[in-house]
Amino acid sequence: MYSDLSKYFADVKDKSAHDVCEFIGGKVKQNDFKNCCAVRMSYAFNKAGIKIPFTENKTVSGEGKKDWYIYRVKDFKAFLNSKNYKKYTTKQNSLDDFDNKTGVIVFDVDWEDATGHVDLFNGKSVEGSDYTSQSKSITLYEIN
């Protein structure tokens, strides 16, 4: 499953937030989110067959209204918790505790415009943007 997530995440991980919104279309495009990490992850999950469910005030539809996209990190964390993935949390500014584990990594950071960042972890490093040094805590949801 992780390999599928990584494959589809590659479609959007290097795009700007604006370009991600354009690529997905629909209400995602209309909102033109400035922070798109949860939208990027929603895209990967939807394409990998782990569908994001509609949740009022927490998801928006893409082009064609067949897939739903979470746009806040805190709501993506709630989605991950609902899936009962094994999770590991560290308060250290290090990813050593996650060596050889793959899955979704969540950085809890107090930014003015976001509560954190969600990305993929390949067992050694973060696939997209790594905010280890800025995090209060880091959680890995293990997906093999």
Set out the residue ranges of the language-model regions.
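N-terminal capping segments
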Residues: 1-66
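Weak global preference for isoleucine
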Residues: 24, 50-52, 70, 105, ...
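Residue-level marker of intrinsically disordered, low-complexity segments enriched
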Residues: 26, 37, 102-104, 116, ...
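Active-site-proximal beta-strand/loop segments in catalytic clefts of secreted hydrolases
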Residues: 44, 107-110, 143
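...with weaker cross-activation on analogous glycine-rich loops/strands in unrelated enzymes
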Residues: 59-131
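Glycine-rich, aromatic-bearing surface loops/beta-hairpins
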Residues: 125-144
